[in-house]
C-alpha cells in the first residue's frame, strides 16, 4: 500500500511539473511576442523618422538644384539677348551701308543718264550732218558715174563685169601659185616625215638574214658509207630518192653526199633521214621507209615550232593553228634567195614600228605584215598567185578585213583600203629592197643589167647610159642638142613603162635622166 501511495504521489508531482512547464512556456512565448512587437514598433518609428529626414534633405537638394537651373537659364537668356542685340546692330549697320551704296549708285546712274542724253543729242546732230553729207556724196557719185559712162562708153553693169573678170583672173592666178606652193610644201614635209618614220623603223629593226640554196651536204664518217648508201644494185639510193623526191649526188667529193632538190621541205626530210641512217648503221629499204616516216614527223614538228616561234617573236597571238603551221612552212621557202619566214617577221616588225609612229593599231599592222606572204607556203600546191592564195587563206580562217586587204594589195593587185595595207606595202618593199636581202644568179643578174641598158639606149636622143646600184638605178645621159628640158620627163616616163612591161626585178628601179649643157668661152 505504501508503494502504491508512493507511486501515486510521484505521478502527481510529475504531472504538476509538466503543467507548470507548459504554463511557463506559454507565458515566455507571450512575453517574447510582446517584446518583438515593441521592437518592431520601435524600428517602424525610426524608419519613419529616417524617411522624413531623407525627404526633407531631398526637398532641400531639389530646391537648391532648382535655384541653380533657374540661375543658369537666366544667364543663358542674358547671353542670348546680348548676342541677338549684337547681330541686330550688325544687320542695321550692314543695311545702312547698303543704303549708302544704293544712294551712291543711284546718283552715279543719274549722272550717266544725263551724260547719255547729252551724247544722244550730239549723236542725233552728227547723224543729221552725216545724212546730209551722204546725200551730197550720192549726188556727186551719180554725176561722176554719168561722166565716166560718157567718157568710157560703158554702162555701170558692163564696167562691173570687166572689173570682176580682171579680179577673177588675178585671184585665180594667185590661187594657183598658192596651191602649188602648198602642195610642194606638203609633199616636202610628207616626204621628210615618211623618211624619218622609215629610217626610225629600220634602225629599230635588226632582223637576221639567211639565204637558202637548192642543195644540202650530208657529211659521212668515211667513204665506205657511200657504197652502203647506194646498196646492192642501187636499191637503197633508189628507195631513198623515190620516198623523198630528192636527188642524191654521190661523186668524188670526199666524205660527203649532196642532196639536190628545189623543195626545201623534202630536202630537209632527206637530210634528216640520211643522217639517222648513217648514225644507225642499218641501211636497207625497210629501214629507209621507217626513217623517212620519222623524219617527216620530225620536220612537221619543226614546222609547227618555227610557226610558234615566229608568232612569239613578233608578238602576234590568236592565230588559227593551221595558219601557224603554214607560217612554219615559210621557214623552208625562199624568194630571190631571201628566206620567206625571216622576210615576213621583218615586214611585221617594220609595219609595227611605222604604225607606232603614226599612232595606228600596232598589233594589227604586225599581224598583217606577218601573214602577207602566207600564200607562198602552198603556192606550189594550189593554183593561183601567192597573193590570191594568201587572201583566201586569211578569209578561210576568219582574219579581219584589214588583214585580208593588206595581203591582197601588198603587190598592188588590189587597191589598199586602209592605212594598215599601205604600211605593209611599204614594209614589204623596204625588206625586199634593202642591200643584201635578196639575191639572184649571176647569169640572170647580168642579163637584167644588159636588158636595162638596152631599153634605155633604144630611145632617140640617148647618148649613153649606166646601170648602177646593183641594177636598182639607171643613169641616162641625153644629147642636149636633140632633147630639150621639156622632153626629159617624157623620156623618163617612157623608159619606166618599158622597164615595167619587159623586166622582172625585185624592189624598184630609179630612172635618172640627165641633160647637160656646157658653154665654153676663152678670154684672150
UniProtKB/Swiss-Prot annotation:
Gene Ontology BP term (one): mRNA catabolic process
Residue span(s) of domain HD: 340-433
Top-rank taxon: Bacteria
Gene3D superfamilies per UniProt: Hypothetical protein af1432, K Homology domain, type 1
Pfam families noted in UniProt: HD (PF01966), KH_1 (PF00013), RNase_Y_N (PF12072)
This protein's UniProt keywords: Cell membrane, Endonuclease, Hydrolase, Membrane, Nuclease, RNA-binding, Transmembrane, Transmembrane helix
GO cellular component, one term: plasma membrane
A GO term for molecular function: RNA binding
Major localization listed first in the record, in broad terms: membrane
Membrane topology: Single-pass membrane protein
Residue intervals passing through the bilayer: 7-27
Alphabetical list of SUPFAM superfamilies matching this protein: Eukaryotic type KH-domain (KH-domain type I), HD-domain/PDEase-like
Entry EC number(s): 3.1.-.-
Similarity comment: Belongs to the RNase Y family.
Annotated function: Endoribonuclease that initiates mRNA decay.
Designated name of the protein: Ribonuclease Y
Amino acid at each position: 500500500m505504501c508503494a502504491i501511495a508512493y507511486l501515486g504521489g510521484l505521478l502527481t508531482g510529475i504531472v504538476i511539473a509538466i503543467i507548470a512547464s507548459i504554463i511557463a512556456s506559454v507565458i515566455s512565448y507571450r512575453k517574447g511576442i510582446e517584446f518583438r512587437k515593441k521592437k518592431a514598433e520601435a524600428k517602424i518609428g525610426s524608419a519613419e523618422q529616417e524617411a522624413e529626414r531623407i525627404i526633407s534633405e531631398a526637398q532641400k537638394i531639389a530646391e537648391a538644384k532648382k535655384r541653380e537651373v533657374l540661375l543658369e537659364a537666366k544667364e543663358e537668356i542674358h547671353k542670348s539677348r546680348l548676342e541677338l542685340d549684337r547681330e541686330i546692330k550688325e544687320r542695321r549697320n550692314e543695311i545702312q551701308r547698303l543704303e549708302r551704296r544704293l544712294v551712291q549708285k543711284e546718283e552715279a546712274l543719274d549722272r550717266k543718264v544725263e551724260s547719255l542724253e547729252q551724247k544722244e543729242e550730239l549723236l542725233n546732230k552728227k547723224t543729221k550732218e552725216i545724212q546730209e553729207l551722204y546725200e551730197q556724196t550720192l549726188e556727186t557719185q551719180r554725176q561722176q558715174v554719168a561722166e565716166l559712162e560718157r567718157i568710157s562708153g560703158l554702162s555701170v553693169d558692163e564696167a562691173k563685169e570687166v572689173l570682176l573678170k580682171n579680179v577673177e583672173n588675178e585671184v585665180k592666178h594667185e590661187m594657183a601659185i598658192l596651191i602649188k606652193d602648198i602642195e610642194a610644201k606638203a609633199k616636202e614635209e610628207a616626204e621628210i616625215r615618211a623618211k624619218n618614220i622609215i629610217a626610225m623603223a629600220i634602225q629599230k629593226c635588226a632582223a637576221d638574214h639567211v639565204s637558202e640554196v637548192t642543195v644540202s651536204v650530208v657529211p659521212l664518217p668515211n667513204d665506205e658509207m657511200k657504197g652502203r648508201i647506194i646498196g646492192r644494185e642501187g636499191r637503197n639510193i633508189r628507195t631513198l630518192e623515190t620516198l623523198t623526191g630528192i636527188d642524191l649526188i654521190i661523186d668524188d667529193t670526199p666524205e660527203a653526199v649532196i642532196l639536190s632538190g628545189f623543195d626545201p621541205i623534202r630536202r630537209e626530210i632527206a637530210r634528216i633521214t640520211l643522217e639517222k641512217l648513217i648514225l644507225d648503221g642499218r641501211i636497207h629499204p625497210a629501214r629507209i621507209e621507217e626513217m623517212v616516216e620519222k623524219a617527216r614527223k620530225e620536220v612537221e614538228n619543226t614546222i609547227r615550232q618555227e610557226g610558234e616561234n615566229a608568232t612569239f617573236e613578233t608578238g602576234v597571238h590568236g592565230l588559227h593553228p593551221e595558219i601557224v603551221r603554214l607560217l612554219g612552212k615559210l621557214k623552208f621557202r625562199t624568194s630571190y634567195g631571201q628566206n620567206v619566214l625571216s622576210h615576213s617577221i621583218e615586214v611585221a616588225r617594220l609595219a609595227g614600228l611605222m604604225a607606232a609612229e603614226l599612232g595606228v593599231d600596232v598589233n594589227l599592222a604586225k599581224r598583217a605584215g606577218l601573214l602577207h606572204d602566207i600564200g607562198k607556203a602552198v603556192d606550189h600546191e594550189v593554183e593561183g598567185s601567192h597573193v590570191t592564195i594568201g587572201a583566201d587563206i586569211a578569209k578561210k580562217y576568219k582574219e579581219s578585213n584589214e588583214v585580208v586587204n593588206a595581203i591582197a594589195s601588198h603587190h598592188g593587185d588590189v587597191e589598199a583600203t586602209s592605212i594598215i595595207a599601205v604600211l605593209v606595202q611599204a614594209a614589204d618593199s623596204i625588206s625586199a629592197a634593202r642591200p643584201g636581202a635578196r639575191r639572184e644568179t649571176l647569169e640572170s643578174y647580168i642579163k637584167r643589167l644588159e636588158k636595162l641598158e638596152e631599153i634605155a639606149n633604144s630611145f632617140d636622143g640617148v647618148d649613153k647610159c649606166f646601170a648602177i646600184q646593183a641594177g636598182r638605178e639607171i643613169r641616162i645621159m641625153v644629147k642636149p642638142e636633140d632633147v630639150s628640158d621639156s622632153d626629159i620627163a617624157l623620156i623618163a616616163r617612157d623608159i619606166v613603162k618599158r622597164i615595167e612591161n619587159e623586166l622582172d626585178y625585185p624592189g624598184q628601179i630609179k630612172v635618172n635622166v640627165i641633160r647637160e649643157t656646157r658653154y665654153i668661152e676663152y678670154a684672150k
